[in-house]
Amino acid sequence: MFIVSDGTGITAETFSHSILAQFEMRFRKVRMPFVDTPEKAHIAVGKINEAFHNEGVPPIVFTTLVNQEANKALRRAKAMILDMFQTFIEPLEKELGLKSTHAIGRFHQNADTEAYKNRIEAINFSLAHDDGQSHKNLEEADVILVGVSRSGKTPTSLYLAMQYGLKAANYPLIPDDFERGRLPSALYAFKPKIFGLSIDPQRLTEIRNERRPGSKYAALENCRYEVNEAEAMMRREGIKWLSSTHKSIEEIATTILQEIKVDRDNY
């Protein structure tokens, strides 16, 4: 499977993941970004045809080429071509009565926009407020994730920052919090922004044993205790939460956005 783009290829790759995930089959992926001239397209065709001759089956090619000459050249490849622009842009041009700009990399040319700056600020905020490192400026947070250690708070926080420009802090619930039976006092003022993550104890012990094998921290009995205490605390405090055990980061983030009613998209 080839991903051919005149830009970074992020759009085509994301689309290909969504489509191919519907098939229980593994694909060998070849990325070919910045194919923005007919000459580069000819080189791409050569590599695609080589794969065809070596493997005996036409490769699948996901493409987002704006340059019409490059597009024509690519279509000489012995492959199944899935052209996102032709599939979606041409019908839209007809429906809207407008011609598209056909600008290369238009979707990602946002380095000077306010949205891009917001995303960078959000990433910096999430890094500074990872794992309870700082309680400073929590009023700026769009969401504050809580949960036991290794329940998925950090990757979810960073995904929310990078994908949606959300300032996401996260705080680990620890034995001291369980003994008190309540959230840390620093978080109470921001309770409407808090969302909890939990995880199956068996899965948690597997993850923790990769980090600290044989420790009390990773023991199944301790993981059960922490998860039970954290879930009980979130129920008492009226905090919405979900189990991250069988959910992707994308699914977790989407649920959080729905539950805390954040309407912001800086992607």
From Swiss-Prot:
Keywords: Kinase, Nucleotide-binding, Serine/threonine-protein kinase, Transferase. This is Putative phosphoenolpyruvate synthase regulatory protein. It catalyses: [pyruvate, water dikinase] + ADP = [pyruvate, water dikinase]-phosphate + AMP + H(+); [pyruvate, water dikinase]-phosphate + phosphate + H(+) = [pyruvate, water dikinase] + diphosphate. It comes from Cupriavidus necator (strain ATCC 17699 / DSM 428 / KCTC 22496 / NCIMB 10442 / H16 / Stanier 337). Its EC number is 2.7.11.33, 2.7.4.28. The lineage of its organism: Bacteria, Pseudomonadati, Pseudomonadota, Betaproteobacteria, Burkholderiales. Bifunctional serine/threonine kinase and phosphorylase involved in the regulation of the phosphoenolpyruvate synthase (PEPS) by catalyzing its phosphorylation/dephosphorylation. ADP binds at G147, V148, S149, R150, S151, G152, K153, T154. It is an enzyme of class 2 (transferase). Belongs to the pyruvate, phosphate/water dikinase regulatory protein family. PSRP subfamily.
